[in-house]
């Protein structure tokens, strides 16, 4: 009621002693969070931020960070950026050319349905691109049914090459691959991971490009990237160059590593999940644990708790994006053996439930109560 507003008196020092001097509503919960963690987190931020704000900074200050991690003990507070490394991934600038969808996924079915219409809409604008072969069939859908997936990919690639990258819509994916075309990441050599795979072998590899559905805990990525020697050479040679279709290769040292990831666009709650050994793109924020006192399953539980979503919205960033530099500012409590055991068991159970289908709401309730009360002490 704006005619009878609440008046809350708060000393200016509260905001000056808060991380980033953020202005927050002085509710009972927020003031309790401030009392327990406000000055501690600000001191950590002031000391460490310039040393962890980029993956390059983390590498530059590697020895100091290792010594700091070794000094941590249960109950200590540390910024997530001091406990992990990682960052944004690859921006191909031409996903249609490089990215395919696994044939057994719902995304593949969507592509099978949309391809004829995409082709028809383009040819209506560019009738000179219609071939004699296409005219033999009653519809473009029937025409496409006569082609193999490799032939369809070649057709769409050639039309894009001739008429422009976005003729089917920016970022439209039209390639479908079988699982047998995807390489076993564990069998790849270091050279193949770094420089690409010969096309005489399966040369697609798993590709994590974010998750619009917002899955927590686990999701087997439905996408794969053509990691051929030719493609990798182009991506690396042209990274950062100006012009349409020029890629940006970020943080390649983290490619093919297991870790944690989330989409940078979220709704109300953060949704973190296990990242399999894959290439990750610019929309898939990824971090990798480097402190055995704070393992990834524990971090996974903390980020997936409702409290951390609330903390981010109140004290770090209240927009609809949660990027890597937001994550690096998260306060993480170094767990006791008992807390670590609880979170490890819960994370494994949640992942197992996710593999079977949906996760019961009781799992989230159990997690929220534990993180808020037992870990952060907000009773």
Question: PLM features: residue spans?
Answer:
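Short Pro/Gly-enriched beta-strand edge/turn motifs at strand-loop
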Residues: 242-244, 312
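A glycine-rich phosphate-binding loop feature that marks nucleotide/adenosyl-phosphate handling sites
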Residues: 320-325, 364-370
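Polynucleotide-recognition surfaces of large bacterial nucleic-acid defense/processing enzymes
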Residues: 1-218, 222-242, 249, 253-259, ...
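Glycine-rich, charged/polar anion/phosphate-binding loops
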Residues: 245-247, 271-272
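Basic, amphipathic alpha-helical recognition segments used for DNA target recognition
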Residues: 253, 263-331, 336-349, 353
